[in-house]
Each structure stands twice: as structure tokens, then as C-alpha cells.
């Protein structure tokens, strides 16, 4: 490494056993029972929930519609970053935590009202889900609803490894890389259509 002009910083370098795991770029890599799993790091989850709490507390007086729009952008961005790792349980935990944060927001906003009144005002039933945080939105004469995004509804997509022998410069693998690119574009377009 020294030939290339690279040095390891002792403060930033940590050598650890894979069974203990390590955090890197918001992910935690660790072996569980002989199988390597990459999950969102606990520090990243805590930081995200603290950010959501701070956002909700600072937006006490805003319209519900604006709060939902703001939270949806944050939730979707965070979830898209972690959608390629083992994150389903984390997404469920986030949804549960955000539910209680938003519930407290509604209760704090209407301190003289009961829980059932707050539920009727801010929550609706959608299919089998009985507690969907929502707001009515008026656009001209039409009225629609905006719902809080649930992290658990995001599809986990695993990274497909490139074949070891495949090279984009080898004409024999031209069709293979065209097919990979098509699949990548299809997934990208599918995620936009909701």
C-alpha cells in the first residue's frame, strides 16, 4: 500500500472478527450462525428516528397534509438506501416507531380531546389496515387523500452479482450485459409507477 501512497489511519482503522461484525456507511456486516448478513446499523436507525422525532416536534402547528408530504420524502429516501440489504424487520420497527411518534403528535395537538376523537380525525381504514395516518387534500372541487408512507411496503431487492467470467468487452457476453441492463431499467421504471 505504501508503494501506492496509501496509509491506514490508526484512529479510523478497526480490525475485528466477522462474528462480532462492523459498521460501514450505515450498514452492519456480521455473521449470524455462519451466514453473513448485512443490515442497517443500529446507530443509523437511531439517528433516523431522532431526525423524524425532531421534525414532527418542530412541525406542531403545520397542516397534516404538509407533515405527511415532508415525512414521506424522508421515509422513502431512507428506505431506498437500505432496500438492498436484510432490512424487512428494521422497516417494520421503523413503521411502528413512526406510528407512535405521529400518534403523540396528534394527541399533543388536541390535548382536550380523547384518543378515539384523535383516531377519527387523523386515521382511516384502508383494506386490512385500520390505522392509516392520512389527510384530506382538496384540489379544486375534487377531494382526495394523502397517506403516510410505510417502510414495510418497500420491496427488498437483492443485488445480482455479475458472473465471474463475464466481461463487458468480450463479444460473447454482449447479450448477457444487454439483458442485465434491460432488467435494471425495468426495475427502475417499475419502482416509479405507484
Predicted stretch roles:
Residues 1-194:
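Non-catalytic terminal/accessory segments
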Amino acid at each position: 500500500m505504501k508503494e501506492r501512497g496509501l496509509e491506514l489511519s490508526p484512529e479510523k482503522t478497526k480490525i475485528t472478527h466477522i462474528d462480532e461484525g462492523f459498521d460501514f456507511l450505515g450498514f452492519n456486516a456480521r455473521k449470524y450462525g455462519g451466514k453473513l448478513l448485512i443490515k442497517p446499523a443500529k446507530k443509523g436507525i437511531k439517528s433516523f428516528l431522532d431526525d423524524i422525532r425532531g421534525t414532527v416536534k418542530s412541525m406542531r402547528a403545520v397542516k397534516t397534509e404538509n407533515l405527511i408530504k415532508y415525512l414521506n420524502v424522508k421515509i422513502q429516501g431512507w428506505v431506498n438506501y437500505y432496500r438492498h440489504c436484510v432490512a424487512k424487520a428494521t422497516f417494520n420497527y421503523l413503521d411502528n416507531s413512526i406510528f407512535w411518534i405521529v400518534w403523540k403528535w396528534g394527541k399533543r395537538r388536541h390535548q382536550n380531546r380523547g384518543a378515539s376523537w384523535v383516531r377519527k380525525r387523523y386515521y382511516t381504514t384502508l383494506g386490512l389496515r385500520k390505522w392509516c395516518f392520512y389527510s384530506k387534500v382538496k384540489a379544486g372541487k375534487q377531494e382526495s387523500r394523502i397517506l403516510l408512507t410505510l417502510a414495510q411496503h418497500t420491496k427488498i431487492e437483492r443485488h445480482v452479482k455479475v458472473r465471474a467470467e463475464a466481461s463487458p468487452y468480450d463479444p460473447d457476453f454482449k447479450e448477457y450485459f444487454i439483458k442485465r441492463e434491460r432488467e435494471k431499467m425495468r426495475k427502475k421504471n417499475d419502482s416509479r409507477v405507484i
